């Protein structure tokens, strides 16, 4: 071929000119764009690229597949084709030898490195040992030289003393004593110096000997490790190159030798013990003691009884209870099953860990504490203004700008003592406390505007206070207005059974004005008087206990909980357990935002450091063990989850019977709202009259107007259903009702409302079932079907015959079989039912002994509910 240009060659092979020029350069050929390329240069480039990419190397492994086909005669005229496939892999011998050679060289290299390393370590150890010996020898020589120097100095001093004694005249007694004392002092100092030098030499020698010993021990340990590693590698190498079956045989032989040597070591005295039967037949039935908590599954019960689960299920079926292996049994059912199976039980407390953790109670001397007061009322009745006046007059005296309340709670100092106020907007925390049976609130102040009278939310506040069982003090506000009418307020509240002391009741009424401050001191005195009547006391020492007023998630500080301490003391650094959350108190702040180190009873504080945001209304307690606190919090979370799953259908009208059975609902709680007061009174009276000895209707709350968030929280706290008569729920209330899964029903006719509540109460009673005959057919002939067996040709004499209904086969008016109608045909068509006077073919499921003259009775099971 003729020479081609660089551009043409690059275009033919599909690459760029620059890359091709670079490849020529790598091959040792200098080319540039525009030059020509001859055949020799092409061949050189091709050889270079082949070597570079490895294509010039010879194959090291080759696999050949062969297939041969032959014919095998089977019998006289039958032949079978046999195909034999063979696969052979050939490996280049030089490669194997090269690999073995490389492995041997690598092993030699590693062995040489190990030898050199070992020699270096031995040499270092020898040098260290020699250095230590040399150091010890020098120390010994120094010691000997010091001893000789000491002896020489002593001799010299003795000679000098004798010379001085000869030359000097006779000394007096005082001079002799002074000279003797000087000599003794000099001798003492010399001995001290010699002892110090001797001690230093001994320490240096001992230190050198210790270093040499440690180095020798370290080298000896490393040599042993190297030797063990080398032996292990040699053993592994032997096994790697040995046959697998030979290795297994060798291991088996070693095990047999070990077993035989073990048998030889055993004494003949104990040989007879192994020949005895290991199982002894029980002389009496095994009686087990099962520890029972509140609930237990069938599988867990079987495991504790050491029997199979189907045995427990059989026993329950004999007792008339159907169950599965994962079904949860309550404590009473489990007790009956255990007693039926002949075992014993022991009731245990599921909250043992929690009780143990909280056992360190505040046992001590009780002292009086400040009352906890909650102020409730309509937002337009001056509640906020009254709070602001109390805070400005009693808390922020002398402080510019007043005080910003951080935690919804604060203390007021009066002449008669302290008062703790709780600000619970929306009454959410108050309702949660009442639902948990808490006693955080001691007194409720009801604020009512003198010019506006009792409003619907005022009635709701009265219902909340009455449900919580706390005393009520009425503050009639806005008395500075000309239209103020306190007598009207007393009259309207008397309809709610809130009677003033002036009218012979038990509730205190105070006329106040948040604008002018009139009556505020009298209100505070009334609170103090009421608290003295209640005789409020608490233990001031010991671990603190309280309740969570409110909680939130602060962006900069994390979970923040407002806690009202009820007993004991809460300190910074304590481990606090609040419901499902726990943590160490990192910081505490009071209502002014100032840091606190200690909080006593009736003191509200803001706590930082919890693991999460606790629920408002949860109990808070100081514990000692953080690990146990974490376990209790996790267990509470699990228990809450199980309870939530168990009460998915709680407060549903259709499931009242199930709730009654489980003991969750002992009465039908209702929150009733209507458009006018007359309807509320009429419906309440009618519903209460429906109560019987078995089922009781309890009107938890009632009022006029739309269904609000307060009604929803009240229903959630008391497990009630919400009934609305010509009213509707607002968006906030609907969100709460959906979140708590509370049943909400609207009515416009009073009779429909009463009938449905009556039906719900009837649903609490056990239903009855009865069988109702719907058709009768007489067998006229019997046919055989290959698919269905015996088919009865029948004439329907009474009622209708329906497909897939339960049936009975009667012979001489005696029931001989009870089953299900499987096939129903008229002529050749499948039909769903056949009326009276028509012929049909009936196939009875799993029964073929049908005879002419039999009667087939078709029936259905009807549930008959008990009604009140």
UniProtKB/Swiss-Prot annotation:
Signal peptide: none annotated. It comes from the Bacteria. Residues 513-515 are annotated as: G5. Keywords: Cytoplasm, GTP-binding, Initiation factor, Nucleotide-binding, Protein biosynthesis. Residues 423-426 are annotated as: G3. The keyword GTP-binding applies. GO terms for cellular component: cytosol. InterPro entries: DNA-bd_dom_put_sf, EF-G-like_DII, EFTu-like_2, IF2_assoc_dom_bac, IF2_II, IF2_N, P-loop_NTPase, Small_GTP-bd. It is found in: Cytoplasm. Its main location: cytoplasm. GO terms for molecular function: GTP binding; GTPase activity; guanosine tetraphosphate binding; translation initiation factor activity. Residues 92-240 have a biased composition (Basic and acidic residues). Pfam families: EF-G_D2 (PF22042), GTP_EFTU (PF00009), GTP_EFTU_D2 (PF03144), IF-2 (PF11987), IF2_assoc (PF08364), IF2_N (PF04760). Residues 402-406 are annotated as: G2. Belongs to the TRAFAC class translation factor GTPase superfamily. Classic translation factor GTPase family. IF-2 subfamily. One of the essential components for the initiation of protein synthesis. Protects formylmethionyl-tRNA from spontaneous hydrolysis and promotes its binding to the 30S ribosomal subunits. Also involved in the hydrolysis of GTP during the formation of the 70S ribosomal complex. This is Translation initiation factor IF-2. It comes from Alteromonas mediterranea (strain DSM 17117 / CIP 110805 / LMG 28347 / Deep ecotype). The lineage of its organism: Bacteria, Pseudomonadati, Pseudomonadota, Gammaproteobacteria, Alteromonadales.
């Amino acid at each position: 071929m003729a020479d081609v240009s660089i551009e043409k060659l690059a275009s033919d092979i599909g690459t760029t000119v620059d890359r091709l020029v670079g490849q020529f350069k790598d091959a040792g050929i200098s080319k540039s764009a525009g030059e020509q390329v001859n055949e020799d240069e092409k061949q050189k480039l091709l050889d270079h690229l082949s070597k570079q990419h490895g294509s010039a190397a010879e194959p090291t492994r080759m696999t050949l597949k062969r297939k041969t086909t032959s014919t095998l005669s089977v019998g006289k005229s039958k032949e079978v084709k046999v195909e034999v496939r063979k696969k052979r892999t050939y490996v280049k011998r030089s490669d194997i030898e090269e690999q073995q050679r490389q492995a041997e060289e690598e092993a030699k290299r590693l062995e040489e490195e190990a030898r050199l390393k070992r020699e270096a370590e031995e040499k270092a150890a020898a040098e260290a040992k020699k250095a230590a010996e040399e150091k010890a020898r020098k120390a010994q020589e120094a010691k000997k030289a010091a001893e000789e120097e000491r002896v020489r100095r002593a001799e010299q001093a003795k000679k000098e003393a004798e010379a001085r004694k000869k030359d000097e005249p006779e000394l007096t007694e005082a001079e002799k004593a002074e000279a003797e004392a000087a000599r003794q002092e000099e001798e003492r100092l010399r001995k001290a110096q010699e002892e110090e030098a001797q001690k230093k030499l001994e320490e240096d020698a001992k230190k050198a000997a210790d270093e040499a010993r440690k180095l020798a021990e370290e080298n000896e340990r490393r040599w042993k490790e190297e030797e063990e590693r080398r032996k292990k590698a040699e053993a592994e190498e032997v096994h790697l190159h040995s046959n697998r079956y030979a290795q297994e045989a060798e291991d088996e032989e070693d095990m047999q030798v070990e077993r035989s040597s073990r048998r030889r070591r055993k004494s003949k005295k104990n040989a007879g013990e192994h020949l005895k039967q290991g199982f002894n037949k029980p002389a009496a039935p095994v009686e087990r003691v099962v520890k029972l908590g509140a609930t237990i599954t069938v599988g867990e019960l079987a495991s504790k009884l050491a029997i199979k689960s189907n045995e427990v299920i059989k026993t329950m079926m004999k007792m008339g209870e159907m169950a599965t292996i994962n079904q949860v049994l309550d404590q009473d059912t489990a007790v009956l099953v255990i007693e039926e199976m002949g075992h014993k039980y022991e009731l245990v407390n599921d909250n043992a860990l929690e009780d143990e953790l909280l056992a360190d109670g505040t046992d001590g001397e009780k002292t009086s504490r400040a009352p906890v007061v909650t102020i409730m009322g309509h937002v337009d009745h001056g509640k906020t203004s009254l709070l602001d006046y109390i805070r400005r007059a009693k808390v922020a005296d002398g402080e510019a700008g007043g005080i910003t309340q951080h935690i919804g709670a604060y203390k007021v100092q009066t002449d008669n003592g302290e008062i703790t106020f709780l600000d619970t907007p929306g009454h959410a925390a108050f309702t949660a406390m009442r639902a948990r049976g808490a006693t955080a609130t001691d007194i409720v102040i009801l604020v009512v505007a003198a010019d506006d009278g009792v409003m619907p939310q005022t009635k709701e506040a009265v219902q909340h206070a009455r449900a919580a069982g706390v005393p009520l003090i009425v503050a009639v506000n806005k008395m500075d207005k000309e239209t103020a009418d306190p007598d009207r307020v007393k009259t309207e509240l008397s309809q709610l059974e809130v009677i003033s002391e002036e009218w012979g009741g038990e509730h205190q009424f105070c006329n106040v004005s948040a604008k002018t401050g009139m009556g505020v001191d009298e209100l505070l005195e009334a609170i103090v008087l009421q608290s003295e009547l209640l005789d409020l006391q608490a233990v001031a020492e010991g671990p603190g206990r309280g309740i969570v007023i409110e909680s939130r998630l602060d962006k900069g500080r994390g979970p923040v909980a407002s806690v009202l301490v009820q007993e004991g003391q809460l300190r910074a650094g304590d481990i606090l357990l609040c419901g499902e959350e726990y943590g160490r108190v990192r910081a505490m702040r009071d209502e002014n935002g100032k840091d606190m180190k200690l909080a006593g009873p009736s003191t509200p504080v803001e706590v930082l450091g919890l693991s999460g945001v606790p629920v408002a209304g949860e109990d808070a307690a100081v514990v000692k063990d953080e690990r146990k606190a974490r376990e209790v919090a996790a267990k509470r979370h699990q228990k809450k989850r199980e309870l939530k799953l168990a009460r998915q259908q709680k407060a549903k009208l259709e499931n009242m019977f199930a709730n009654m059975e489980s003991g969750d609902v002992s009465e039908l709680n209702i929150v009733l709202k209507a458009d006018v007061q007359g309807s509320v009174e009429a419906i309440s009276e009618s519903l209460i009259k429906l109560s019987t000895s078995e089922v009781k209707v309890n009107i938890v709350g009632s009022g006029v107007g739309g269904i609000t968030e307060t009604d929803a929280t009240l229903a959630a706290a008391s497990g009630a259903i919400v009934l609305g008569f010509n009213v509707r729920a607002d968006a906030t209330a609907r969100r709460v009702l959906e979140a708590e899964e509370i049943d909400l029903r609207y009515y416009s006719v009073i009779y429909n409302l009463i009938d449905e509540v009556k039906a719900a109460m009837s649903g609490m009673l056990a239903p009855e079932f009865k069988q109702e005959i719907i058709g009768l057919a007489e067998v006229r002939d019997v046919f055989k079907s290959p698919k269905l067996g015996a088919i009865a040709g029948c004439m329907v004499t009474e009622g209708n015959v329906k497909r897939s209904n339960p049936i009975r086969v009667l012979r001489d008016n005696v029931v001989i079989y009870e089953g299900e109608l499987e096939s129903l045909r008229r002529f050749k068509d499948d039909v769903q039912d056949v009326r009276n006077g028509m012929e049909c073919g009936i196939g009875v499921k799993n029964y073929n002994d049908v005879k002419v003259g039999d009667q087939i009775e078709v029936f259905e099971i009807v549930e008959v509910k008990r009604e009140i």
